[in-house]
A protein has these predicted regions:
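Post-transcriptional modification and biogenesis factors for structured RNAs
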Residues: 2-251
Length: 251
């Protein structure tokens, strides 16, 4: 692993932005284009791993709720969904998620086909982000998303200016994560309820345009020897911080 040396060292801690982590060469991933209304396949098998996951065909009298999918009831449900959504149609799952989505958004700059986008999208689904925004190139590495993007509202923006205009029109604060002078400390920051986290490319971090368009930036404290953390990891930390401050967490 080769970290980029972008982090800033302070006497007591490292405060960093997501940075570069390279591993051994991997096969070229398949890239897909994203649009504001990306079509969803009705059935989402896992992209890899054991075939026998999930549940088999429904046993006994069939349920009659409109949320159930006849093909899944007959053939079994092998999708990557929580148990409460077994045998539900994709449309029913999305509708149920839409009724209770959280008020944060996630945006990723995609100028170089960033490998972290899939991981960030998967975390956005787990924490129930309202929308995911891809800025720059439309095509992105879907592998890490584990088909969770099918249950998200994924929007594309040509540049950060259009992203900022869209968010500000909805009253959403745009916050970038980067190690910049004046950045808020995530650990002590009173996070807005309606906020979008913007993540830059691995290595260079936020683009100059993004830094100018953001309403502010925040950084994540580090205390070990590495100068950087992976962008996908940083995104998960930011989203979970929102959950801790604003979500209705079961006791």
């Amino acid at each position: 692993m080769i970290p980029n040396s972008k982090g800033l060292v302070t006497p007591r801690e490292y405060r960093c932005s997501p940075d570069l982590n390279l591993s051994s060469p991997q096969p070229a991933p398949s890239l897909v284009a994203v649009t504001a209304e990306e079509p969803r396949a009705p059935y989402d098998p896992m992209p890899h791993g054991p075939a026998e996951v999930g549940v088999g065909p429904w046993e006994g009298a069939l349920p009659t709720g409109v949320e159930y999918d006849a093909q899944l009831l007959a053939e079994g449900d092998r999708r990557n969904v929580v148990d409460r959504y077994r045998y539900w149609s994709m449309e029913a799952i999305v509708a149920d998620l839409d009724a209770r989505r959280h008020d944060f958004h996630v945006a990723i700059e995609n100028w170089q086909h960033d490998f972290n986008i899939g991981t960030i999208v998967r975390s956005a689904n787990a924490f129930l982000a309202r929308e995911v925004h891809i800025v720059g190139r439309k095509r992105w590495n879907r592998r890490g998303a584990m088909v969770t993007d099918r249950y998200q509202h994924v929007r594309h923006h040509e540049d950060v200016e259009s992203l900022a205009a869209y968010l500000h029109g909805k009253g959403v604060t745009l916050m970038g994560i980067d190690n910049l002078p004046g950045s808020e400390h995530l650990e002590t920051w009173a996070m807005p309820r309606s906020v979008c986290f913007l993540f830059g490319q691995e290595g260079p971090g936020l683009s100059e345009d993004a830094r100018e368009r953001c309403d502010g930036t925040f950084s994540i404290a580090q205390f070990g020897s590495t100068r950087s953390i992976n962008a996908g990891v940083a995104a998960g930390i930011a989203m979970h911080t929102w959950i801790r401050q604003h979500a209705d967490v079961p006791r």
